Amino acid sequence: GIFAGSGVGKSTLLGMLARGSEADRIVIGLVGERGREVKEFLINCLGEAGFARSVVVVATSDRPAAQRVCAAWTATAIAEAYRDDGHNVLLLLDSVTRFAFAQRELGLAAGEPPTTRGYPPSVFNMLPRLVERSGRTSKGSITAFYTVLVEGDDHNEPVADTLRGLLDGHIMLSRALAEESHWPPIDVLQSLSRLQPHLVSQEVGQSVVAARQHLSEYRRHADLIAIGAYRNGSDPRVDAAIAMREPLRNFLVQDARQVADLSASQSELIRLVRTPAGT
């Protein structure tokens, strides 16, 4: 799941994923987006190369709630059909929150009782049914990214909270990083992957842990560092975190038009955390 407030860059990140994907097929579901945003995504974010190898299902915000709900199921069904044909599929659904909004409209209109923040029970029944349809079978696979629009940057609102328990990975986009022109604005410390130990080597896993420790140490002492109250040499861990700050930031920043090689990125991360003072 890609969790983000409005205007933080989730559409740009989806376009980067689509253009850089090595999947056999790409299926994109755009649910509840404005018509202008759909056009901008297809032209600017997805691009000609990405669009040429993608199936796009769209139900804009002005369409009836039933049609918006149907768009999410349709995109998922198309991905399943490709998977059953033996393909590895990338499914991008933007956004599962607006799918939940549409189902809320239908549920309330049907007379369901509102529960948490006005959501009827059918919303929380449909969310697991939707996301559980992705994954690997004996024939192929569906790797799915679901964007979650966090209302008011509240990551504990009901839809986001439910999806955190359903999804294997959480990519948290930070408004503060976006304001610093840190693109993509992924908050590494808030993000996690439950499957990471099964997907990367032990060496890469240890490098990830080391990098996160440096970032965490710097964040804990950021106020002291900013006002000049921290004295170099007071704590070796903080000294290392300060030295690694810029190298790690440069590693995490990526131009939207750039496609990074996974093996090269892993090797670069290993080199960074092994090099004294990040030099």
Give the role of each language-model region:
Residues 1-279:
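P-loop NTPase catalytic core
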